[in-house]
Regions:
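N-terminal active-site segment of His-dependent metallophosphoesterases
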Residues: 2-71, 79-89, 160-162
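Helix-adjacent hinge/juxtasegments
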Residues: 72-110
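Active-site neighborhood of phospho(di)ester-bond hydrolases with catalytic His/Asp-centered motifs
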Residues: 23-25, 49-55, 72-77, 101-104, ...
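Beta-strand-turn-beta hairpins that frame and shape the catalytic cleft
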Residues: 12-22, 92-101, 139-145, 169-177
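Active-site environment of divalent metal-dependent phosphoester hydrolases
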Residues: 28-32, 56-61, 78-84, 107-112, ...
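Conserved beta-sheet core of the metallophosphoesterase superfamily
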Residues: 72, 110-175
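Well-ordered alpha/beta subsegment
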Residues: 180-181
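Pre-active-site segment of Zn-dependent metallo-hydrolases
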Residues: 27, 31-43, 102-103, 107-119
């Protein structure tokens, strides 16, 4: 079972029956991009909070995103000791009665079997992950597995567009959306 640590988010605004979460991963700032693309700030303009699924490379990414909303993040394989010392490998947040897990690389390259195990072991209704730089939405039964892709370094280049994702959560449902930028 993966070790789960918690970051504390400020209390979410109580008003509204739907929470919108901005999902982002694999920003690689400043190694592969000088900054987060401006389009990300437009897409995330009215989110309740932001989830970053790792490979920030520099903590300034969190500072930049926090201009919009609170940020919940995990470290990725390209994040150095400073980031690994501040962020957990696995994180989660409960929105209404939905438990949303965050992890950079839950063996996504080997299919959903390992991701399904992680979701079941941790009681996740949804698992946000990164690492592949390629966006995807997959449902396995009633479990959601979503990769927002990369806004700075999509793979494969020239075929895959830079992307982020939005997750709209209500008491009744979770609705994922990939947004190309």
């Amino acid at each position: 079972m993966a070790t789960e640590q918690s970051q504390v988010l400020p209390k979410l605004r109580e008003m509204g029956s739907t929470k919108t979460i901005g999902l982002i991963s694999d920003t690689h700032v400043p190694a592969r991009a000088r900054e987060i693309p401006k389009e990300v700030f437009v897409v995330f303009e009215s989110v309740d909070f932001i989830v970053h699924a790792g490979d920030l490379v520099d903590l300034s990414v969190i500072d930049d995103l926090e201009q919009l909303a609170p940020v919940l993040a995990v470290y990725g394989n390209m994040d150095g000791p400073e980031i690994r010392g501040k962020l957990p490998k696995v994180n989660s947040v409960k929105v209404f009665d939905w438990k949303i897990g965050i992890m950079h690389n839950p063996s996504a390259l080997f299919g959903t079997r390992k991701m399904r195990e992680i979701a079941l072991q941790n009681g996740f209704d949804a698992l946000v992950f990164g690492h592949t730089h390629s966006s995807s939405i997959r449902w396995e039964g009633n479990k959601l597995f979503i990769n927002p892709g990369s806004p700075t370094n999509p793979v494969p280049p020239f075929i895959t567009k830079p992307s982020v994702a939005l997750l709209r959560v209500s008491k009744e449902r979770i609705a994922p959306e990939i947004v190309q930028i």
